[in-house]
Amino acid sequence: MSPDKLTIKTKLAFGVGATGEGATNWIFAGLTFFFYNQVLGLSGSLTGLAVLIAIIFDAVSDPIMGSISDRFISKLGRRHPFMFAAPFPTVIAIYLMFFPPDGLSEYGLFGWLIFSTILLRLSITLFAVPHLALGAELSDDYFERSRVMSYNNLFGYMGVIIMHIFVWFLIFPYFAGEKIGQLYQESYTPIAIFSMALISLCILSSAYFTKDRIPYLKQPSPNESHIKITDLFKDIYGAITNRNYARLLVGMFFLSMLIGTHETLGIYMGTFFWELSPIQIGWLIINNIIGYAFGFILTAKLHQRFDKPIVIVATVLGLTIFWSASANLALLGFAPERGSWELVMMIICLGSVASACGSILHIS
């Protein structure tokens, strides 16, 4: 079989790694801010600052990790050693994040959050950057790579869906008492344990079951194989001075602001703005399932019919409009009663369109 023609097994093995990455990102974006702010009592400004610092470290580490991986030489190639190593610091970071020492002052808790979130972002970068590069190297065929990234996108969202269902249907309703479940510190213990097991299994499975593709992967030339600090900075400078990449970077910056704000405030919106129960918040995952499915099915076809820039611009507009549509309708007085199942249905319908746009955009 031609190296360009990939088996379903390879596509599935590559994709399952994104499940671990998706679960990690869901933990970071969906729970961390709320846990430290509403459960542990850290002020919103300090919580936000800690998360910002971690994201800045993440932004710097991504190109450095890419440059190191591009130049790395080993019997396992230049991607797989990092993919195999990533689960261990990731698990440690999640444990530290959800089990801070007792008796910390507010600034002590602030420092602990900074340390644990930086470690988490750096750890998942250790997997995500080589894994993404691996996807681009699995085949030289453009449409085959689009299919590979469709699997990656689908499995990434599966990580989100699995964590969402586990947390909102099984954990938070179980711990509900005088307060809603998400406000009890004890409810986050099983979440941390489950996420650590899921992330480790998915990342290690992806690394193990794609290692048979190593002989087909590109290797660095002898001149590129030496890792030097100066080369790392040259790579970063070369990237940011590339006009097309700079435009893409600016676009990704604003898109990341949109996505990060939406994901971080999602638990606040469901709990305090919409006044939904944990079960009702759990059912909101339907919009993601519908949207991800349509994105998985349609993306390759859209790429065959339209240029990528057209697809990207259209889906960004759709994502922006429909993600905020429910809240805008509520503020204008056109939404169903808060806490009602009619409201849940409206959020699901509008959110499905937004999720489809986001899924297509992510793959593109």
Give a label for each model feature.
Residues 1-364:
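Membrane-embedded alpha-helical bundles of multi-pass transporters/translocases
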